[in-house]
């Protein structure tokens, strides 16, 4: 993952994809990742160099327009774009997110991923229906992370989805009421 980000720094999309498809994708396929997931993984993470300091070309352009400090803008971009760093791993470990699998798996994995991202984002920001204290943030983060653990990792991972759904419903109900 780090190698994809480093090799993608300062390059256009097509160049990043060609370079990473030659250097990184074959290794991922060799260890058992499906070819589609491997190529989505490298493309997605290769483009994350646009918002990842120290290069963060897109963030630095935005900083110059806003007359803001470039590195601070880069770190803020990373914080706001945290899902973009997680999604490629979800592609690798949950192929149903790339429409490879049964419709039941697709529904379960997509709904868990959406709810997990939603809960983690609320926990990171510190606001849902109202301002969250440190315990509320921790509860939202924990529920979201449990939902983001792919069920394909093993039979134990299915239980993390159940616990994440129950905990997520509980913290949302607690915050809304």
Predicted features along the sequence, with ranges:
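Alpha-helical transmembrane segments of multi-pass membrane transport proteins
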Residues: 1-177
